[in-house]
Amino acid sequence: MKWWQASLALAALSLLAGCGGHKTKPSRGGHATHQQDGARAGTSSSSSSDRFHDDLSRPQSSRYRDRSDSIPDGPIPDIGKLIEPVPKVEPRSLYGNKSPYTVLGRSYKVLPTARGYDERGIASFYGNKFHGYKTSSLETYDMYAFSAASPTLPLPSYARVTNLENGKSVIVRVNDRGPFHANRLIDLSYAAAVRIGIWPKGTGLVEVRGIDPRQPGQELPPPPVVTRRHPGLYLQVGAFANTDNANRLAQRLREANVGAVQVSDVDVNGQRVRRVRVGPLVDVDRADAVSARIEGMGLPRPQVAVD
């Protein structure tokens, strides 16, 4: 294995599917696609206008591309008065939990449960462009509900999302897949993004903790303690047992002038490894630009780290 091929394993998750509704979900790059009923299911095309079809013949890469979204263009309810979901045991959705699946050349595997899930990264939001369309679990997306899309959590599941920059948190019900834009951890509904201050900026640094409603008294994990210090945003490019490989990578990154390069020794599952990171980075836009430069060097996609 070449020295630069070490790094972190790809995350995991599921797909969408289905039929039942009246709107076709737009791709995250674009436009709604309508398909004749008989073209996929072998039924009469006369009923096609009455039924929803998620066109599975299209590659996932055409369905989920990160583009600009928009806020509501009509009256906006008072987000402060909206009620957060109460976590409860629900059956696993028949749709949206296929595992593994591939989007934009990257493979994902659906987690069996939200229990123990605790990740930090970048949150984005999706709003008006998807409002009223089917989610991956074939529910109707409501941007005024406290919901979210995850590439790895099972559908449906619950999580507490905390904005690490201001300490605000919200309980969300995960019922959709995404985001598949590089460096994103979770997509929040418009309401959830407003509740914790991700909107109007559009992105933010968050911690996502899975909720297990099967464990009485432990349904709601406490939000993390947020200090006044602004959380640091980094890109982890590799972690190596061989220190020479780590040092070579660090030198290559420094020569490319991608930003401050940090090399540190850490314990991972009882093993001592040397970690190579770029950062801290000033904001999400800078992280996206640096990530693209690193991939352009022929290196694996770096992983976002928030400390």
Where are these regions (language model features)?
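Intrinsic disorder/low-complexity segments enriched in polar/small residues
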Residues: 3-6, 220, 263, 304
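Conserved Rossmann-like nucleotide-binding pocket used by diverse enzymes
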Residues: 15, 236, 277
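Extracytoplasmic
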Residues: 241-307
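Detector for methionine-enriched segments
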Residues: 1-3, 143, 297
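Secreted/periplasmic proteins
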Residues: 19-158, 162-234, 239, 245, ...
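Sec-dependent bacterial lipoprotein signal peptides
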Residues: 1-19
